[in-house]
Amino acid sequence: MITIPALTLADLLLPMRWTVWGIALATVVFIARQARHVAPQVRRTSAALVAVTAVLLPLLPTPGAALQQGIRIGSLIASLLVTINLLSRAAARVPRVRDLLEKLYHVPPSRRYGVISLASQFFGGLLGLAGIAMMMETAARQKNLSYQDKLSSFSAVTRGYAALSLWSPMYSNMSIVLAMYEGAHWAGVLPVALAVTALFLVLGITLDKLFGSHRHARVQASAVSATELVREGWPVLLGMFGFLSFMVLTSRGLGLPISAVIIATAPAAAWLLNAHLHGGIAAYGMATRQLTLDMSSFRGMSGEVMMFMASGCAGTVIGSAIPAAWTAAIGAAVAGSPALACLTISSVIVLMSAGALHPMLSAVIVGASLDPAQLGLPVLAHLTAVLVGWGLAIIVTPFSVVSALASRWSGIPVFMISFGANAVFVLLALGTSASMLGLLVRLMAA
C-alpha cells in the first residue's frame, strides 16, 4: 500500500507519464492481492464504473489525458486517506485528546451544538475523517443524552464536516478540486472557503437555536464551561494548528502542492508523536514498530482504493463525454446570473448524490462538464461552488461514509440522521452560499 502514496508524491513533485502508469500498476497489484477484503457491493459498483469508463473512453477526443487525470484523482484520495490515518491514529492515543473530546459533550445544552461544530473544524479539519469518527464515537458513549440532544450533537458533527470540507487540505475534496483547475492553489481559495465555512457554522447554530428542543434544558451541575474547555484544550489545538501552519508554510516556501506536503510529512509527524508517547530510550524503535503496524492494517482499505480509482476515472471520462451542446444549453440559461450559476453547480451535485451516485463522482462529473467558461464564472467561484455541493451532498445522502458512521454510532436510522436531519440545512446552505458567491463575482467584476 505504501507504494501508491510514494508514486503519487513523485507524480505531484515531477509529473511524468511513467509515474501515472506506475500508480495504475501498483493499484492493480494491491487490489488483486487484497481482493478478499473488498465487499461484494464495492466490487460490483467498481466493476460497473470500470465498464462505463471502458465504453466511453474510445469516444473521447483525448482518451489518454482523461484516463490519466482520473488515475491521478483516485490515487490522490487514497494517498491522503492512508497518510492522514497514520497521524490520526497516533493522535487518538494521546490521553489529553481523549479527555478533551469527552468534555465537549458536557457543555451546557444550549451551547453544545456551537461548541461541537467549532471543535469539528479542529479535530476533523486537522485529523481528517478519523477525527470526525473520534467525535462520533465519543458522542455515542454519552448515556445522559436524550434522543433530540443526540440528534443535535451528531448533526453538529456532520454539518461541521460539510463546513470543514470547504477549507481543510486534509480532505480529498479540496485536493481533488484543485487538481481539476490548472493554476489553482489552496492559499488562493482559502479566504472564500473560510467565509462560506463561517456561513455554514452560523446557519447551523441559528437553526439549532430556533428548533432545538433542548434550548430550555437545565444546566447540569457537572457542566463544563467554555473557559474550562479552552484551558484544557489549548495545548491540543495549538499542536494541531502548529502542524497545519508548518504544512502551509512549507508548501508556500518550496512552491509545492499542499497535498504533496501532507503525504510527505504526515507519516513523519505520526512517528514523532508515537515516539513522544512511548518515551524513554527505546521510544524511537517502538514508534517505528507502531507505525509499521498501523501501515500493515491498511490492507483492509483495498475496497476504498478500488472505489476511489474507479470513481476518479469514471468521473473524468463521463464528464468529458457529455455532449457540449447539453452543457452549452445549461450555460446559456444561467450565465447571466452568477448566483444562479453557482446554485446550479452545487444543486446538481447534491441531486446526483441523492440518487445514490457517489458524491466524489458527482462532483468530478459536474466540475468537468460545466466548466467556468460555459457558466461565465471566475475559476474561484466555480471551484467553491463545486466544493459546496460536494460537502453538502455527503451529509444529506444516506449513501455516504459520513452518514453511515453517524447512523452506526448514534443508533439513529441512516435516512433520519442524513436527509431527515440535514435537508432544511442543505437547502438553506445552497441558497445562501450561492448568493454569497454571486455577490463575490459581482464585486470582482466591479
PLM features: what roles do these ranges have?
Residues 2, 17-58, 77-84, 237-242, ...:
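Hydrophobic mid-bilayer segments of alpha-helices in multi-pass membrane transport proteins
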Residues 62-94, 117-121, 286-323:
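Core transmembrane alpha-helical segments of multi-pass membrane transporters/permeases
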Residues 76, 102-115, 146-153, 301-304, ...:
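Membrane-interfacial loop-to-helix junctions in multi-pass transporters
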Residues 118-127, 156-166, 315-316, 349-355, ...:
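Helix-loop-helix module between adjacent transmembrane segments
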Residues 134-147, 176-184, 335-395, 405-410:
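Membrane-interfacial helix-loop connectors
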Residues 144-237, 404-436:
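Membrane-core helix-loop-helix motifs of multi-pass transport proteins
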Residues 243-362:
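Transmembrane helical segments that form the transport core of multi-pass membrane transport proteins
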Residues 434-446:
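Juxtamembrane boundary at the C-terminal end of a transmembrane helix
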